[in-house]
C-alpha cells in the first residue's frame, strides 16, 4: 500500500507565503485522500505491485487520477523550500537565460502561463529531449511524467485548494509567494 509522503519541511515552514492551515488541508487532507483512494482501487489489479511512477504511466481513469495526483503533489512539495526563492543558479539558470534571455523574462512567461491556465491545473517547468527548457500547462491530474523525452523540473499547483485559504481567488498573489519559495536546488537536481 502507498503511504502519504511526509512534507520535506515543517508544516509551518512556508509561512507567510503558504500558511500552516493551507498545508494542513492541502497535504493532510487533499494529498492524503488521493493515497487512500488509490489504495482502495489497486488491490487485485495489475497495478497492485507496481511503483507509483509505473502506475501513472500505464493507467487511466480513477487509478490514473489518484496516482498522478499523489506524484504531482509530492513533486510540488519538493518544488518549494523555506530556503528557496531568489534567482536560479547553476545549469537551470543557464538554460533559463538561453531560452528566455533573463530570469525576469522567464518569470513573466511562467506567470502568464500560470495565470491563464484554466481551472484545476498545473504549470510545469520541463526539460525537453534536446536539453532546452519549456513551460507547459496540464489540466486536472495530467502530468509531464507521461510524456516521452520530457523531464519535469519544477511545478506550481494551480488547483484552488493550493491557494484559496491564503489568497482566495487571487492567483497572481499566490504566484508571488511561489517565487519566494521556489526550490532551485531541486530544479538543478532534476535538470542534471
UniProtKB/Swiss-Prot annotation:
It comes from the Bacteria. SUPFAM superfamilies: Fe,Mn superoxide dismutase (SOD), C-terminal domain, Fe,Mn superoxide dismutase (SOD), N-terminal domain. One of its GO terms (molecular function) is metal ion binding. Signal peptide: none annotated. PROSITE patterns: SOD_MN (PS00088). Binds 1 Fe cation per subunit. It catalyses: 2 superoxide + 2 H(+) = H2O2 + O2. Fe cation binds at residues 26, 73, 157, 161. Its cofactor is Fe cation. It is an enzyme of class 1 (oxidoreductase). The keyword Chaperone does not apply. Keywords: Iron, Metal-binding, Oxidoreductase. Its EC number is 1.15.1.1. Pfam families: Sod_Fe_C (PF02777), Sod_Fe_N (PF00081). Belongs to the iron/manganese superoxide dismutase family. Homodimer. Destroys superoxide anion radicals which are normally produced within the cells and which are toxic to biological systems. This is Superoxide dismutase [Fe]. It comes from Pseudoalteromonas translucida (strain TAC 125). The gene is sodB.
Amino acid at each position: 500500500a502507498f503511504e502519504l509522503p511526509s512534507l520535506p519541511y515543517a508544516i509551518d515552514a512556508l509561512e507567510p507565503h503558504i500558511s500552516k492551515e493551507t498545508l494542513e488541508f492541502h497535504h493532510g487532507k487533499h494529498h492524503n485522500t488521493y493515497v487512500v483512494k488509490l489504495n482502495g482501487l489497486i488491490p487485485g489489479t495489475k497495478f497492485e505491485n507496481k511503483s507509483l511512477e509505473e502506475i501513472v504511466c500505464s493507467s487511466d481513469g480513477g487509478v490514473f487520477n489518484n496516482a498522478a495526483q499523489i506524484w504531482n503533489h509530492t513533486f510540488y512539495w519538493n518544488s518549494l523550500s523555506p530556503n528557496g526563492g531568489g534567482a536560479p543558479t547553476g545549469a537551470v539558470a543557464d538554460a533559463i537565460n538561453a531560452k528566455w534571455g533573463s530570469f525576469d523574462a522567464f518569470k513573466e512567461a511562467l506567470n502568464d502561463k500560470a495565470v491563464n491556465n484554466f481551472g484545476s491545473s498545473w504549470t510545469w517547468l520541463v526539460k525537453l529531449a534536446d536539453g532546452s527548457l519549456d513551460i507547459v500547462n496540464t489540466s486536472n491530474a495530467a502530468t509531464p511524467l507521461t510524456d516521452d523525452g520530457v523531464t519535469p523540473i519544477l511545478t506550481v499547483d494551480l488547483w484552488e485548494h493550493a491557494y484559496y485559504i491564503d489568497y482566495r481567488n487571487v492567483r497572481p498573489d499566490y504566484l508571488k509567494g511561489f517565487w519566494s519559495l521556489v526550490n532551485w536546488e531541486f530544479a538543478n537536481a532534476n535538470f542534471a
